[in-house]
Amino acid sequence: MSQVRRVEALAHTIRTWEPMLIPGLLQTESYARQVFRGRPGVTAEEVENAVRFRMHRQAVLSRPRPPMYSALIDESVLRRPVGGRELMREHLAKLLEVLNPPYLTVRIVPLSAGLTTGCLGAFEVATLRDCGPDHAYLESAEEGRVTNRAQTVQALIVRWEALSSMAYPVDKSRDLIHEVMKSYG
């Protein structure tokens, strides 16, 4: 099991910020496949391995006693047609299906927020169930890495809170996701 899967398996709470894509734990298989196909020089086998790994990670949200999962997503993510209009319509419909406040919430940071601290990149912060320090997962174009370095984790929590203060409430975010989904036809 990878380090990120181990941390997510022990998590009581997961907070994530995503400025470019739907968060990995909420991606459909088709959406994830499009994301991984976008990497230059990647083979079909590497794409399928990455998709399988991503789908296995998602099991954490459907286990008995899943973590509280709160995602903040930049509005531009909804409007970026990954894989085309039909795939985005299907993906946003699936996203609306899985929302389950208060256990699984998505809030949208509107474009009107302008340049935010979130433009520095995607991240996830996991608070573990009575078994150690908080951990962060930082994803780059090449790889993801997990850290429990207190200074890094605390800085990401502050960034998440700042972004959260700019995000629409859950109901308004759901309405926006639905509106954008309909715009895809």
Residue map of PLM features:
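Interdomain hinge/linker segments and adjacent boundary elements that couple functional modules
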Residues: 1-80, 148, 158, 162-185
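C-terminal regulatory/effector modules of DNA-binding transcriptional regulators
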Residues: 84-185
